[in-house]
Design a protein with these regions (language model features):
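A structural motif corresponding to the C-terminal lobe/cap of the Radical SAM core domain
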Residues: 1-118
Length: 118
């Protein structure tokens, strides 16, 4: 998950480092003759949406552009890794995340907006 209020750039890069460590462990543990080709690791992140009645309910939500920048930090860190071809990275669409935040924090007045948009 990206976009937590306490998140640092090291936290974001840590996602890529964990994927790299998993790939390295595979090559260390599985004997070469037992491997079925190269390892393929799928890394997927979603973006934090503050929800009511949780410790982060009053935390601000990032803008769409900020979410994309955070995803690019992870993507660029994966590209700099030794096993970059073994790791695929995708992320949740930021516009859907913003909509989710609107629905999660909105009240009954949101229904008019939803009806008009639909």
């Amino acid at each position: 998950m990206l976009g937590l209020p306490t998140e640092t750039e090291d936290d974001m890069k840590g996602i890529a480092h964990l994927a790299q460590k998993i790939a390295e462990t595979y090559y260390e543990v599985v004997p070469k003759e037992q491997r079925r080709g190269k390892v393929q690791i799928n890394v997927s992140t979603s973006f934090f949406v503050p929800k009511p009645f949780t410790p982060f309910q009053w935390a601000p939500m990032f803008r769409e552009e900020d979410f994309i920048e955070k995803a690019k930090v992870v993507k660029n860190e994966i590209r700099s890794q030794l096993n970059q071809r073994s790791i695929r990275y995708n992320w949740h669409e930021p516009d859907v995340t913003v909509l989710e935040g609107f629905l999660a924090r909105g009240d009954r007045r949101c229904s008019k907006v939803i009806l008009k948009a639909y």
